[in-house]
UniProtKB/Swiss-Prot annotation:
The active site is at 169 (charge relay system), 201 (charge relay system), 278 (charge relay system). GO terms for molecular function: serine-type endopeptidase activity. Residues 151-314 are annotated as: Serine protease. The chain crosses the membrane at residues 74-92. This is Serine protease HTRA2, mitochondrial. InterPro entries: PDZ, PDZ_6, PDZ_sf, Peptidase_S1_PA, Peptidase_S1C. Its EC number is 3.4.21.108.
Length: 434
């Protein structure tokens, strides 16, 4: 009965995932059997024939003993194995308790956490930045059947109920178009223009959606030259793009930039701003918008409208909304040419000539074309980004206001003299009526 129970115990150990223990005990027993047989054969070799029966009896007895379960081998292997398993489980439980906070932590440590202040700024305000598309309702994509994108820009949410701030030149003076806004989460909504101030180049849009993340507005009056700033937007239609730099100047007068009828001291920054950044926020390290990205002259020289001036525009726009005045009745719409331009002041000309060898040395005035909308009259007429307009219909062009005057004079065609690098060229543009 005892031998049967031992055999049952061996079978239980073998079936219950202890093969190593089981086979170790069997191998030990087999090794003892082999040693005993070898000793018996050596001892009994001298009396070969006379002791055959005794040797057979001894071998039978040894085999019977070896077939019994070796308790000493079992204890030798089972006890350390059990203690190790218990200790391992305790260590695993302890490690789980200790490692849980570390695994769940998402923030980096060390120098990444200490010096990545730009990432902290972006994480707190990027969700409020939007991508603005101007769709041409007269031309449609061959494959999708959707209106093609005529232009694009940026903006940011300033009220949870869908009010968005951007540049005026992003959304107006583009006939036969519709405005679409894409949020940071990918949702797209049609937008309507609520208010426009062409003098300050500011506009507000409205989309029909609530509970949007809002950009906090800071104070541009407290800025100092050298402060870190972050520009967010969609340059070249690449949404959710982040660039960083410093404030180069907090008091860049509009007269220095050749912008007449604008009493604005622009913020100058070396943060990379290019096509599509217009209307996006310039943010301080507290995650507050301190400016609206407006224009770029060259690499390292860009300008933003101070947020203090923007707040005045927003207050006046709110008053106009209460009175029910609409954007179309308050602001005349000019003929459409499809360019974004910048007056070349003497200081800007000097800077451009020092940076590029393609600037003609005898150039004294003009307007820099730094963006041409695809499909626009300017694009069809042959204007390219980087061209400098010096004359329109035989009249000198000294600033951007001269170009606006030429658009409003009623001439059907605009015959331009431009500088493309060091070459002088003639182009003819037929503006579209509003």
């Amino acid at each position: 009965m005892a031998f049967r129970r031992i055999n049952n115990l061996e079978l239980f150990i073998k079936r219950c995932s202890a093969p190593t223990l089981y086979y170790s005990s069997i191998r030990t027993a087999t090794g003892n059997n082999y040693s005993n047989n070898t000793a018996n054969i050596t001892t009994d070799s001298s009396s070969s024939s006379n002791n055959n029966s005794n040797r057979n009896n001894k071998n039978d007895n040894n085999n019977e003993d070896n077939n019994k379960f070796n308790w000493r081998s079992l204890v030798r292997f089972f006890v350390p194995f059990s203690l190790g398993a218990v200790a391992s489980s305790l260590v695993m439980k302890r490690d789980d308790l200790e490692l849980t906070p570390t695994i769940s932590a998402a923030r980096p440590s060390g120098r990444r956490r200490e010096f990545n202040f730009i990432a902290d700024v972006v994480g707190g305000c990027a969700d409020s930045v939007v991508y603005i598309e101007i769709k041409d309702t007269r031309h449609f994509d061959y494959f999708s059947g959707q209106p093609i994108t005529a232009s694009n820009g940026s903006g940011f949410v300033i009220e949870q109920n869908g009010l968005i701030l951007t540049n005026a030149h992003v959304v107006i003076n583009k006939p036969h178009t519709m405005v679409q806004v894409r949020l940071s989460d990918g949702r797209t909504f049609p937008a309507t223009i609520e208010d426009v101030d062409q003098t300050s180049d500011l506009a507000t849009l409205r989309i029909q959606v609530n509970n949007l993340p809002v950009m906090r507005l800071g104070k541009s009056s407290t800025l100092r030259s050298g402060e870190w700033v972050v520009a967010l937007g969609s340059p070249l239609a690449l949404s959710n793009t982040v660039t960083a730099g410093v404030i180069s100047s907090t008091q860049r007068a509009s007269q220095e930039l050749g912008l007449r009828n604008r009493d604005i001291n622009y913020l100058q920054t070396d943060a990379a701003i290019t096509f599509g950044n217009s209307g996006g926020p310039l943010v301080n390290l507290d995650g507050e918008a301190i400016g609206v990205n407006s224009m770029k002259v060259t690499a390292g020289i860009s300008f933003a409208i101070p947020i203090d001036y923007v707040k005045v525009f927003l207050e006046r726009a709110a008053e106009r909304r209460k009175k029910g005045s609409a954007y179309k009745t308050g602001y005349p719409v000019k003929r459409y040419m499809g360019i974004t331009m910048l007056t070349l002041t003497p200081d800007i000309l000097f800077e451009l000539k020092s940076r590029s060898q393609n600037m003609p040395s005898n150039l004294m005035h003009g307007v820099l074309v730094w963006k041409v909308i695809v499909g626009s009259p300017a694009h069809s007429g042959g204007l390219q980004p980087g061209d400098i307009v010096t004359h329109i219909n035989k009249k000198e062009i000294k600033n951007s206001s001269d170009v606006y005057d030429a658009l409003g004079c009623g001439d059907k065609e605009l015959n331009m003299i431009i500088m493309r690098g060091v070459k002088q060229m003639h182009v003819t543009i037929t503006p579209e009526d509003p």
